[in-house]
C-alpha cells in the first residue's frame, strides 16, 4: 500500500503531499500499537489521497464547463456546432 501511494503522488507531482504521506505511513508501520488504537489516522491518509486527486480535476472541469456554457449560451449562438 505504501508504494502505491508514493507512485500515485509522484505521478501527480505533489512533492509536499508525498512528504506528508510518508510521515504518517512510516509512523503507523513502525508502531503497530498506535495503528490499532488510531484507526481513523490510517483511514484519513487513504481518503486524503483520493480527495485531492479527484478535487483538482473536478473543480477545473466544472469551472471550465460553466464558463464555456455561459459564454456559449450567451455569446456563441451555435453552441451545438462548437460542442461537436
Curated annotation (Swiss-Prot):
Residues 1-15, 67-84 have a biased composition (Basic residues). Residues 1-22, 64-84 are annotated as: Disordered. One of its GO terms (biological process) is response to stress. This is Uncharacterized protein DDB_G0272720.
Amino acid at each position: 500500500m505504501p508504494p502505491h501511494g508514493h507512485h500515485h503522488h509522484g505521478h501527480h507531482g505533489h512533492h509536499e503531499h508525498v512528504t506528508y504521506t510518508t510521515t504518517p505511513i512510516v509512523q503507523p508501520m513502525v508502531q503497530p500499537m498506535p495503528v490499532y488504537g488510531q484507526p481513523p489516522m490510517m483511514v484519513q491518509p487513504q481518503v486524503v489521497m483520493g480527495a485531492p486527486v479527484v478535487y483538482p480535476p473536478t473543480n477545473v472541469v466544472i469551472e471550465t464547463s460553466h464558463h464555456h456554457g455561459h459564454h456559449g449560451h450567451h455569446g456563441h449562438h451555435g453552441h451545438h456546432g462548437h460542442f461537436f
